[in-house]
Amino acid sequence: MESLIALVNKIQRACTALGDHGEGSSLPTLWDSLPAIAVVGGQSSGKSSVLESVVGKDFLPRGAGIVTRRPLVLQLHRIDEGKEYAEFMHLPKKKFTDFAAVRQEISDETDRETGRSSKVISTVPIHLSIFSPNVVNLTLVDLPGLTKVAVDGQPESIVQDIENMVRSFIEKPNCIILAISPANQDLATSDAIKISREVDPKGDRTFGVLTKIDLMDQGTNAVDILEGRGYKLRYPWVGVVNRSQADINKSVDMIAARRRERDYFQTSPEYRHLTERMGSEYLGKMLSKHLEVVIKSRIPGLQSLITKTISELETELSRLGKPVAADAGGKLYMIMEICRAFDQTFKEHLDGTRSGGEKINSVFDNQFPAAIKRLQFDKHLSMDNVRKLITEADGYQPHLIAPEQGYRRLIESCLVSIRGPAEAAVDAVHSILKDLIHKSMGETSELKQYPTLRVEVSGAAVDSLDRMRDESRKATLLLVDMESGYLTVEFFRKLPQDSEKGGNPTHSIFDRYNDAYLRRIGSNVLSYVNMVCAGLRNSIPKSIVYCQVREAKRSLLDIFFTELGQKEMSKLSKLLDEDPAVQQRRTSIAKRLELYRSAQTDIEAVAWSK
């Protein structure tokens, strides 16, 4: 069972080393889940003397005002033999055998965190391990003494600051409260009892300790309290007799003080019947045993919590991405990998693995054909317009057989209007591709880390799409112009021939251009234009896909990659200027993950179920 307390000690030290102090944080905390015994009391309650009595050594700083300004995690390790010594976690290679030096180091380490002349407090704990054959395996957290008034230039908030710190420790359900109260004061005014009652109203995890029993007024005693009648707790009260200030000034050692404490209870008529559960030695053994039981009961839940938290931290760490490489080659490789991830996401949208690419089909199947249908060819082929163009094309010499030049002008005037829908189709596909670029940007988690790289890649991709759009527009309009530039003669040769096709040259020009004749010309032209439109409905989508979609899949970032290989280290670093908040978050999560994995390994190595 002793290994269980050692296990918690080890995890507590790891928590402090890796920045988990249990205070409010956006990261999960393991510290708050560990069973601990917090020592709570007013500044004049005898709290320090109780701790020194349990340890059997003088090692705590003393003085007026607030002496304890940081939590002291006191880990006691029982050894079979050898000289007593102490170790601080912040000085791992140094053993202290002089406990006066331990006292000084506690003061110095407190000043390093809070400032030498400062009166402020800090939640960052000091870890002190004491190895001795005269102690039990136990961990105690010494907290600053509660006070009611700020003195000696202390900030006005110090009273509330201390109370908030103490409360933040003892309100946790895994915290065992050791409430120190002086017997020579009314228990109703006890700072320790007052605050412990607020967080543990039923007294289920509070141990009461009465100090200064030997200093009570003559004719009074603490029997009612010690027997649970004055203030009832789940666990029995423990009375202790500490060294007086005169004893401390005379350097009375702890062995003599413990002997005198035993003699006091054994010879006292009031407390003789309670001797077996009184005194600092009994207090230490009782707390050690209780802590072992609590730790064992918490281990299964702690394991589940650790496993769940490791999974959550790993997921977030993966989402945040890898840290930036230090060398130019590593940076270049990172950028290339991120760009490839983006490019792959973009291709998946086009290929149908992701949504969005189907909108291009909608342009070809719906938007483009509908735009052609909306072209008002009937206006171009109205009776007046046909007569006008035919007449203008004939010039001063009327046509002999068929008005070929008139036909050409009519067809050209219709086909030129197709340029509008063709350009609109090019622009519509361009707009869809740009939307897919922005969508792919948002879906490429790595790009979220690097705002500058995101802007550069987005700009390069859009520039490529713009170039492809321009090429596509040229190719698409060329298809339309080709239809205008060379007509399919065979179409007209297959048209039904009429005797009136050319008219009688001897008739007047107005007789020759009668309504029936002009209607036939308009009908023939419309049939030809419809044939051309049917062909363009097939060829224009092919041109757009070839020039825009296919090229976007094949070479979207080619120019960016070429320029990237020529960039210097400083410019590569600028592209990877990750948000400092993300960097800090990744570092914090990595440390916290290290803590949880270490705790998981430590727990699995302990045969706690035996």
Swiss-Prot record:
The keyword Acetylation applies. It catalyses: GTP + H2O = GDP + phosphate + H(+). One of its GO terms (molecular function) is GTP binding. CDD domains: DLP_1. Keywords: Acetylation, Cytoplasm, Cytoskeleton, GTP-binding, Hydrolase, Microtubule, Motor protein, Nucleotide-binding. Residues 41-48 are annotated as: G1 motif. Residues 211-214 are annotated as: G4 motif. Residues 241-244 are annotated as: G5 motif. It is found in: Cytoplasm; Cytoplasm, Cytoskeleton; Cytoplasm, Cytoskeleton, Phragmoplast. Residues 518-610 form the GED domain. Residues 142-145 are annotated as: G3 motif. Its main location: cytoplasm. Forms homodimer and may homooligomerize and heterooligomerize to form the phragmoplastin complex. Binds to PHIP1. PANTHER family: DYNAMIN, PHRAGMOPLASTIN DRP1B. This is Phragmoplastin DRP1B. It comes from Arabidopsis thaliana (Mouse-ear cress). The lineage of its organism: Eukaryota, Viridiplantae, Streptophyta, Embryophyta, Tracheophyta.
